[in-house]
């Protein structure tokens, strides 16, 4: 259900609908709810390679007199800098050895700037950036950000996070979805007061907005990252990096691709799939697949939710270095195990990676047990909140509802929410 929020003095109040929400959901004292941010936002991204500075955009020629520019740079120009409504983001590949204690700041508030000898306004690193938890920034990146900050609007900032291996080309699109807060409010009051992280506050206007609350009390998939033991309204400092590819099906929301009560609603264009569906204990998903050097994660095969509709594309594969998308069937090559898997890798050797407990089952049809064949099409069916395979189904009813799809074809399947027991 929806409630109305009111922003007052840096805090939010659920001014309407809170009491009804508590009554309808049976929310008990001490249980948590999910605050689902529906406000559209886009965050621009700058990609750095493993050397952290070899792909820095070129400093505009008007500032050539600045002698502190990085030594190595390419001819990539800076354009489409964000406005005050769209914060910026920098993806920096860092290591624990380069930790800097002064590389973090928690505020979006403009800090008074200083002036250099030429009278131009400059902004410090802390005035330009705020870092995700456990994120370190190297001196050359700090220096570079301080330089390009002179060309940004004053309300623009970089949100600095870390990624695993570089699995995207420079010209690919990367989206950032911010995980919304876990809240615990008093169920006996008529209103619920809470605060949001400072970088989210910038996306809200000083008006009453309609938002969505979901309860996590009845989640079928317990998820340790909900951190139910932490204090109420404490920020969960996590981000979701999403790789996007060109798609004939632009969709509004990437939804329900992960565990219950951890839905992602990020406005975007083009089909995509977020990396946070990988198991939280996986430190480097690309290395877990096959070294991470010759695989583009979901570069050739793409999938994503379009509201309550699933859109899936299967691309043909022609070469040992081309990625493919497959997943183990409950009856093919997995000993009948009743767990979903999503797999990405290159042919031969079964170099696939999967996850348990997600909402999607997807795999390529295969004649041999335990192997996905190159170029085979994908056939899926969404039934009862799951995606089932196009072949080898024991139920004639399910098998009759889908047909073969040519490799590269797009199709949409209506999603049915699972019935509550």
Curated annotation (Swiss-Prot):
Record's subcellular location: Nucleus
InterPro entries, alphabetized: B3_DNA-bd, DNA-bd_pseudobarrel_sf
Compositional bias of kind Basic and acidic residues: 95-107
Residue segments, region Disordered: 92-121
GO MF, any single term: DNA binding
Transmembrane segments: none
GO CC annotation terms, alphabetical: nucleus
Keywords for the protein's UniProt record, in alphabetical order: DNA-binding, Nucleus, Transcription, Transcription regulation
Origin: domain of life: Eukaryota
DNA-binding region: 1-51
Record field: compositional bias (Polar residues): 108-121
Protein name as annotated: Putative B3 domain-containing protein Os08g0333500
Species this protein is from: Oryza sativa subsp. japonica
């Amino acid at each position: 259900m929806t409630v109305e929020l009111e922003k007052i003095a840096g805090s939010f109040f659920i001014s309407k609908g809170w009491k009804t929400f508590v009554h309808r959901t049976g929310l008990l004292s001490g249980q948590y709810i999910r605050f689902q941010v529906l406000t559209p936002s886009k965050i621009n991204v700058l990609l750095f390679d493993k050397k952290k500075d070899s792909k820095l955009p070129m400093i505009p020629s008007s500032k050539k007199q600045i002698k502190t520019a990085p030594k190595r740079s390419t001819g990539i120009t800076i354009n489409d800098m964000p406005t005050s409504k769209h914060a910026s983001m920098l993806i920096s590949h860092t290591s624990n050895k380069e930790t800097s204690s002064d590389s973090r700041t928690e505020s979006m508030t403009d800090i008074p700037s200083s002036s250099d000898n030429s009278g131009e306004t400059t902004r410090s690193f802390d005035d330009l950036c705020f870092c995700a938890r456990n994120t370190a920034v190297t001196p050359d990146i700090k220096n570079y950000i301080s330089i390009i900050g002179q060309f940004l609007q004053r309300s623009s900032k970089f949100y600095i996070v870390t990624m695993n291996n570089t699995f995207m080309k420079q010209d690919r699109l990367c989206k950032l979805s911010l995980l919304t807060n876990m809240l615990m409010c008093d169920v006996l009051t008529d209103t619920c007061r809470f605060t949001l992280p400072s970088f989210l506050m910038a996306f809200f206007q000083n008006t009453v907005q309609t938002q969505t609350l979901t309860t996590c009390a009845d989640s079928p998939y317990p998820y340790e990252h909900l951190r139910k033991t932490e204090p109420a309204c404490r920020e969960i400092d996590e981000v979701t990096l999403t790789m996007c590819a060109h798609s004939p099906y632009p969709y509004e929301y990437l939804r329900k691709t992960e565990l219950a009560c951890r839905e992602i609603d990020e406005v975007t264009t083009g089909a995509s799939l977020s990396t946070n569906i990988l198991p939280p204990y996986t430190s480097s998903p690309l290395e877990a697949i096959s070294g991470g050097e010759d695989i583009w994660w979901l570069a050739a095969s793409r999938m994503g939710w379009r509201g309550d509709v699933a859109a899936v594309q299967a691309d043909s594969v022609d070469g040992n270095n081309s990625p493919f998308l497959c997943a183990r069937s409950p009856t093919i090559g997995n000993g009948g195990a009743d767990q979903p898997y999503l797999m990405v890798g290159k042919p031969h050797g079964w170099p696939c990676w999967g996850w348990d407990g997600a909402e999607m089952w997807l795999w390529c049809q295969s004649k041999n047990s335990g192997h996905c064949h190159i170029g085979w099409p994908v056939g899926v069916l969404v039934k009862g909140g799951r995606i089932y395979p196009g072949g080898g189904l024991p139920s004639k009813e399910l098998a009759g509802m889908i047909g073969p799809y040519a490799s590269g074809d797009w199709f949409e399947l209506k999603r049915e929410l699972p019935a509550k027991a």
